[in-house]
């Protein structure tokens, strides 16, 4: 998967700053300035996201904001964004990553088969664990050919994403998944009782193992983000 390839690449490179892009992209050397390099070397940011353009030089939606619509998780995307503003995730995985912070998050979850939910998983987790992804308008990259649109289908990968990122509740200085969340998950998953219970228990154990790494929960995160953009 895309995430697995990036995980492997992160383990092999020596530098702490890693630019992830596709061989169908072009980046002009004119944009590589001392000012840009100084920005990208900032160690407080998980990922710097560039402005992206199609092969027809049309802006792509690089600013992504999490929201809850009718009780369901959703992402609102915008092609216009302020420099150094936050975004939930890097479009098409493209950006300058801080390798140490990336590895500290555990990298991409290889068990997720959906590119979209694999990307959303580490993106939401990064914010829940106190990281941030920032848009850098001075870094501009364009595609040289067509590209595939994101497949946001709610599949099995979404269920694992839901358990790991949307189900935990943050109390005091740690996070946990309430047992009562199981019935909500059971109805949402369309899985049989025993299979749903097994996956739910695995997720509870994972959250328990990492409970002190959480700095907030999804509900609080999304509310704060929406207030910032009012």
Located regions from the model:
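Glycine-rich, basic loop-to-helix element that forms the pyrophosphate-binding segment
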Residues: 1-13
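Short beta-strand-to-loop acidic/aromatic patch adjacent to the donor-nucleotide binding site
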Residues: 16-26
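Active-site-adjacent helix/loop segment of glycosyltransferases
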Residues: 132-229
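Active-site acidic short loop of glycosyltransferases
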Residues: 13-16, 107
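Short, flexible, basic/aromatic active-site loop/helix in glycosyltransferases
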Residues: 67-88
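A short, conserved alpha-helix in the catalytic core of glycosyltransferases
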Residues: 89-97, 101-106, 112-139
């Amino acid at each position: 998967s895309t995430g697995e390839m990036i995980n492997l690449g992160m383990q092999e490179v020596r530098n702490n700053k890693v630019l992830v892009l596709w061989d169908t992209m072009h980046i002009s050397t004119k944009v590589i300035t001392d000012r840009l390099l100084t920005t990208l070397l900032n160690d407080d940011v998980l990922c710097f996201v560039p402005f992206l353009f199609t092969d027809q030089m049309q802006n792509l939606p690089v600013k992504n904001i999490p929201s809850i619509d009718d009780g369901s998780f959703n992402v609102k995307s915008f092609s216009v964004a302020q420099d150094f503003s936050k975004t939930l995730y890097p479009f098409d995985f493209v950006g300058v990553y801080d390798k140490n912070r990336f590895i500290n998050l555990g990298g991409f979850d290889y068990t997720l088969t959906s590119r979209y939910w694999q990307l959303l998983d580490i993106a939401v987790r990064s914010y829940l664990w106190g990281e941030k992804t920032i848009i850098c308008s001075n870094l501009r990259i364009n595609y040289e050919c067509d590209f595939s649109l994101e497949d946001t289908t709610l599949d099995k990968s979404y269920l694992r994403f839901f358990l790991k990122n949307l189900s935990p509740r943050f109390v005091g200085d740690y996070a946990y998944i309430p047992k009562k969340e199981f019935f909500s998950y059971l109805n949402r998953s369309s899985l049989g009782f025993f299979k749903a219970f097994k996956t739910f228990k695995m997720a509870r154990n994972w959250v328990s193992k990492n409970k002190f790494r959480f700095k907030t929960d999804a509900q609080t995160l999304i509310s704060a983000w929406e207030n910032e953009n009012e």
